[in-house]
């Protein structure tokens, strides 16, 4: 029986993580979780899983939950999030929160020698050097939950990582993959939220449409697998059947395939190095699919992917700036305060405005994050 702490239980990854726990009650126990403002959902999860600690975002929601939570301790805010991440009984911490708020809980959980199931891209994007140093220092495993990084991780099982020639990350292309730049001037929030392959939260769905999501994954892959950016390629693959590939020195290429279902990589992170049945996910039927398609990525068409490569290669504090600018811009787009292509413009302005710090401390990263958010808000 593995004890799990889950950060971000009400989001897309969080709800699918609970599906996995539900499928294997003899293998996993939920000891703590966090939610934002979805209190009705939190009540249902408490009643089903009887965790010891639950964290909510707002202090005013604590009393509402305490009235129905029985023996479950209710905490709130950033301190509450840390309490969930550091639960003494938790062996695995699944970080499924969205945004840079996931950084500090990840670092503290690593210091507490918890195994980390990492679904929060922003943690490695903003502070990859700090996270990987901490993981090495405390001998902690970072197990990828993203389908692309899980695919690479599985392809590398038993392989000599020094023999890697390149990583090939696949991209569905998002909601607007078939639209021209001119057509993107007129797209709506509702258009952007209709992803062709995956069911995800609103922020990551917009990131998929701008291709920032893939850019974040490139930076994440750089840190997780220690591969230079020059050896990380992105290929457009509309079917989302091949989740990523690894090419080795001898030009052999290994790929991980499967139907688009996030529960597969989530469960693998929880069961690694073992595997368990996942019977209610669709079995891959290659003759039904028939043909798989691949296209070269156009970084002028998808400018956010170019920004991510530039930020990653520049290094230091630049990825944190790009990430903070993106979070503010995407939120403004979701609120219909800016157009779709303005997201790119705001990110570019923030990156051009920033003076890079080569090896920022945690405090400097948090300061830069806050300053960038203020700068972008002033531009809107």
UniProtKB/Swiss-Prot annotation:
Q: Which GO terms of type biological process are on file? A: isopentenyl diphosphate biosynthetic process, methylerythritol 4-phosphate pathway involved in terpenoid biosynthetic process
Tell me which InterPro entries the record gives. Answer: DXP_reductoisomerase, DXP_reductoisomerase_C, DXP_reductoisomerase_N, DXPR_C, DXPR_C_sf, NAD(P)-bd_dom_sf
- Any idea which GO molecular function terms this record carries? 1-deoxy-D-xylulose-5-phosphate reductoisomerase activity; manganese ion binding; NADPH binding
Top enzyme class, one word, equals oxidoreductase
Function of the molecule: Catalyzes the NADPH-dependent rearrangement and reduction of 1-deoxy-D-xylulose-5-phosphate (DXP) to 2-C-methyl-D-erythritol 4-phosphate (MEP).
What UniProt keywords are attached to this protein's entry?
Isoprene biosynthesis, Manganese, Metal-binding, NADP, Oxidoreductase
Where, in this chain's numbering, is Mn(2+) bound? 146, 148, 217
- The entry's 1-deoxy-D-xylulose 5-phosphate-binding residues are 121, 147-148, 172, 195, 208, 213-214, 217
User: What domain of life does the native source organism fall in?
Assistant: Bacteria
Q: What is its EC number?
A: 1.1.1.267
Q: Which catalytic reaction applies to this protein?
A: 2-C-methyl-D-erythritol 4-phosphate + NADP(+) = 1-deoxy-D-xylulose 5-phosphate + NADPH + H(+)
Pathway info: Isoprenoid biosynthesis; isopentenyl diphosphate biosynthesis via DXP pathway; isopentenyl diphosphate from 1-deoxy-D-xylulose 5-phosphate: step 1/6
Similarity comment: family membership: Belongs to the DXR family.
Statement: the UniProt record of this protein carries the keyword Cell division: no
Q: Which cofactor does it need?
A: Mg(2+); Mn(2+)
UniProt protein name = 1-deoxy-D-xylulose 5-phosphate reductoisomerase
Coiled coil regions, renumbered to chain: none
Q: Does the keyword Magnesium apply?
A: no
């Amino acid at each position: 029986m593995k004890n799990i702490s889950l950060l971000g239980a009400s989001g897309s990854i969080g709800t699918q993580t609970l599906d996995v726990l539900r499928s294997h009650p003899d293998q996993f126990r939920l000891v703590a979780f966090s939610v934002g403002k979805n209190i009705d959902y939190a009540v249902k999860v408490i009643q089903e899983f009887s965790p010891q600690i639950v964290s909510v975002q707002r202090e005013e929601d604590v009393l509402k939950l305490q009235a129905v939570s029985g023996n479950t301790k209710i905490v709130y805010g950033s301190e509450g999030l840390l309490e969930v991440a550091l639960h003494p009984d938790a062996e695995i911490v699944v970080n499924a929160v969205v945004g840079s708020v996931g950084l500090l809980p990840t670092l503290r959980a690593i210091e507490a020698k918890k195994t980390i199931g990492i679904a929060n891209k922003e943690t490695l994007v903003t502070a990859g050097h700090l996270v990987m140093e901490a993981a090495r220092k405390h001998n902690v495993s970072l197990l990828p939950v993203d389908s692309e990084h899980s695919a690479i991780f599985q392809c590398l099982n038993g392989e000599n990582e020094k023999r890697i020639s390149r990583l090939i990350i696949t991209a569905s292309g998002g909601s607007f993959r078939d639209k021209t730049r001119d057509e993107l001037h007129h797209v709506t929030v509702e258009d952007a939220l209709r992803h062709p392959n995956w069911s995800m939260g609103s922020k990551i769905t917009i990131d998929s449409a701008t291709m920032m999501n893939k850019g974040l994954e490139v930076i994440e892959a750089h840190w997780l697998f220690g591969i230079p950016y020059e050896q990380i390629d992105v290929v457009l693959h509309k079917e989302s059947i091949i989740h990523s590939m690894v090419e080795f020195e001898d030009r052999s290429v290994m790929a991980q395939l499967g139907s688009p279902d996030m529960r597969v990589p989530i469960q693998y992170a929880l069961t690694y190095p073992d595997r368990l049945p996942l019977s209610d996910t669709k079995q891959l039927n290659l003759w039904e699919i028939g043909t798989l398609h691949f296209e070269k990525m156009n970084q002028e068409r998808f400018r956010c992917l170019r920004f991510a490569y530039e930020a990653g290669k520049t290094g230091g504090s630049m990825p944190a700036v790009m990430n903070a600018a993106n979070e503010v811009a995407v939120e403004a787009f979701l609120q219909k305060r800016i157009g779709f292509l303005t997201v790119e413009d705001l990110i570019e302005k923030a990156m051009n405005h920033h003076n890079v710090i080569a090896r920022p401390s945690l405090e400097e990263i948090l300061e830069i994050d806050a300053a960038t958010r203020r700068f972008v808000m002033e531009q809107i």
